[in-house]
Amino acid sequence: MQKSKILNIVLAGIILILLLFGKGSLTPADSIKQLFNTPAADTATGTQNKRSLGVKNLVFPEPAMVIGSYDKDGKPNIMTAAWFGVANSRPFKVSVSLRPATYSYHCIMASQAFTVNVPDASLISYVKFAGKYSGRDMNKFTETGLTPVRSEYVDAPYVKEFPIVLECKLTEYHDLGSHRQFIGEVVDAKIDERLLREDGKVNMDLFDPVVYGQGEYYSGLELIENINEIVPEKVNEGLRE
């Protein structure tokens, strides 16, 4: 009789453990299904209610960055570029693609360096001006009243009035067709102290970045979710691969 009671207690304990920890055995796919609470589709054509447009740039939004460089005579220049992105993590590299017709293309080739000046929405007039006119015809700093500052680590100017700056040394470039993609290693990042949180991140409550798409500029980004709050950590790790 005593053995029977012990056996029942052991079985009850096993059942309790399975009930408490059974969810831990979920695969990432199972976790994702529970996350969205919708049945996963077995097949999808990917064309339902969509119109084929052929080859067309529908990437939106794109960052509106102002690229700083010196020409061969040492004149500071800036231009607005949206064909920009992060190219690598370690070492941290960014890329910007420019047409050979642009003045900045030749400036970067001459100096082997450039800066990335990240604008706030309050600076949109300067962003538009830098993207509309060529440095061949004028000194854009003189025309706009912006202040060029010689970078500490690379041979390129940055814009004092812009809140975030990346100093980049040119490490390689690739001719892709209409554009040359410049890859720059970031050797220093600068930010206005008022925008810096204690954890070293940008305070997005105080910073209103500019994005570009379809010939227009936009601002007013709004936080909708934190990735670590919306996706289980184990699944999150898999999504990053």
Residue ranges and their predicted role:
Residues N8, L19-L20, G24-E241:
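Basic, polyanion-binding surface patches
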